[in-house]
């Protein structure tokens, strides 16, 4: 009998995590598998509005209703204590974010889910290597989605971690039904793209390459959020659950998110996974440096001082005039991504999501956070110093205006 697709990579992750793992071409496909396996169509999923818009569309593609939770103003993750009891009584699942690798309040969320008898799903795409109470993120819920395009910069690959082998085998079959045939040309591009990025950075060509891509219209996004295309999104809802119906949104930034990559891509991912611990160590060093700056939140400084640095995917730095700073940093060969502004309820509107009952913390955090790559910590500190970047603090928070657009973005 042939081995399941990607089983060697999955076995590597199983040894690291202590849970059965299913290999997937991306974390977004892994999350979709979990949502389809445990949630009936129409189920309501509690999630943070400070999140990748792709995740919103994965939830919609699964035929579910995203319910936006109040978040902590310090880290953008769900604040369980701020979720109204009426909301808790009317949700069918909870999806964590572990934003930038900072762990969710997963012990409280797990306790709530157990009381309610609903599944807890962990989006651990940013959080390989993060721990809570001595346990790795990805081992607290019913299932957890991991990404290899973050920490090891693989441009492909992910895992769905589950509790037992029987469930793993069931999900492998569901995954196989959703995979599309791979192509050698796409596999070559997936393999070479991270090498090209590394070369651009090492040759100090980030600024000219980025500006050229902007001028030529080669960037898939013109803003922090993709165009919503609301009328098409409304029409797609009639076909949910369906990845095909939501393809134009779910594939953004990763067109091969469900391609059956061949041995070339999987071989490269195996090499990159072998260097994961080295990557995590470098990230901890960068987090230590950035946590000691004025732009780090007190919560991050305290966590680093008492528990040691986390191997964050990005370090959320709190700054004034963030959008202008993003443009200025390109002059210092620093391109900032993973900015999730505006929050999903302001972005999508009440037709597609249930808005948060307290949107102010999410709006403040989303507007003031600059996600800093800890692998570039020294360069970023130098750039911030030269640019005289002012730190922001939520204690200065004034009433945040309702920034919901008069019509849905993308219409």
Regions found by a protein language model. Give the residues of each.
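Short, conserved charged micro-motifs
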Residues: 168-169, 321-328, 377-382
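Conserved PLP cofactor-binding pocket of PLP-dependent enzymes
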Residues: 181-188, 301-308, 322-366, 389-407
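Conserved glycine-rich beta-strand-loop-beta hairpin in the small C-terminal domain of fold type I
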Residues: 28, 232-276, 280, 284-291, ...
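Conserved N-terminal alpha-helix of the aminotransferase class I/II PLP-enzyme fold
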Residues: 1-29, 37, 50, 283
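PLP-dependent aminotransferase-like
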Residues: 11, 29, 36-115, 119-131
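Active-site PLP attachment segment
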Residues: 139-176, 212, 218-219, 231
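Short hydrophobic/aromatic beta-strand micro-patches
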Residues: 161, 316-320
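Non-catalytic, alpha-helical, charged scaffold/linker segments
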Residues: 173-242
């Amino acid at each position: 009998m042939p081995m399941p697709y990607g089983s060697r990579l999955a076995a590597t992750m199983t040894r690291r995590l202590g849970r059965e793992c299913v290999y997937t071409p991306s974390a977004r496909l892994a999350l979709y598998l979990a949502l389809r396996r445990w949630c009936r169509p129409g189920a309501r999923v509690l999630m943070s509005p400070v999140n990748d818009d792709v995740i919103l569309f994965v939830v919609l593609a699964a035929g579910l209703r995203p319910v936006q939770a109040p978040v902590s103003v310090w880290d953008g993750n769900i604040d369980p204590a701020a979720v109204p009891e009426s909301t808790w009584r009317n949700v069918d699942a909870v999806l964590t974010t572990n934003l930038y690798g900072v762990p969710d309040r997963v012990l409280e969320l797990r306790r709530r889910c157990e009381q309610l008898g609903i599944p807890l799903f962990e989006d651990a795409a940013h959080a390989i290597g993060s721990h809570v109470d001595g346990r790795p993120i990805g081992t607290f819920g019913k299932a957890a989605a991991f990404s290899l395009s973050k920490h090891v910069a693989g441009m492909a690959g992910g895992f769905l971690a589950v509790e037992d082998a029987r469930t793993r085998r069931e999900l492998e079959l569901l995954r196989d039904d959703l995979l599309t045939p791979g192509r050698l040309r796409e596999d070559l591009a997936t393999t070479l793209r991270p090498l090209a990025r590394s070369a651009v950075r090492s040759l100090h060509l980030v600024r000219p390459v980025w500006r050229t891509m902007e001028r030529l219209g080669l960037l898939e996004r013109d803003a922090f959020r993709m165009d919503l295309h609301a009328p098409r999104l409304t029409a797609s809802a009639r076909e949910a659950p369906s990845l095909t119906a939501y393809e134009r949104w779910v594939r953004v930034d990763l067109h091969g998110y469900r391609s059956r990559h061949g041995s070339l891509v999987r071989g490269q991912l195996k090499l990159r996974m072998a260097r994961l611990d080295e990557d995590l160590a470098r990230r901890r060093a960068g987090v230590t440096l950035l946590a000691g700056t004025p732009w780090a939140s007190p919560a991050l400084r305290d966590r680093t001082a008492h528990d040691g640095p986390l191997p964050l995917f990005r370090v959320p730095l709190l700054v004034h005039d963030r959008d202008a700073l993003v443009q200025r940093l390109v002059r210092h060969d620093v391109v900032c991504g993973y900015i999730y502004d505006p929050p999903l309820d302001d972005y999508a509107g009440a037709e597609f999501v249930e808005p948060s009952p307290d949107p102010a913390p999410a709006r403040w955090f989303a507007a003031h956070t600059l996600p800093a790559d800890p692998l570039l910590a020294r360069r970023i500190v130098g750039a911030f110093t030269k640019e005289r970047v002012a730190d922001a603090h939520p204690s200065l928070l004034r009433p945040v205006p309702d920034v919901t657009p008069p019509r849905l973005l993308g219409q």
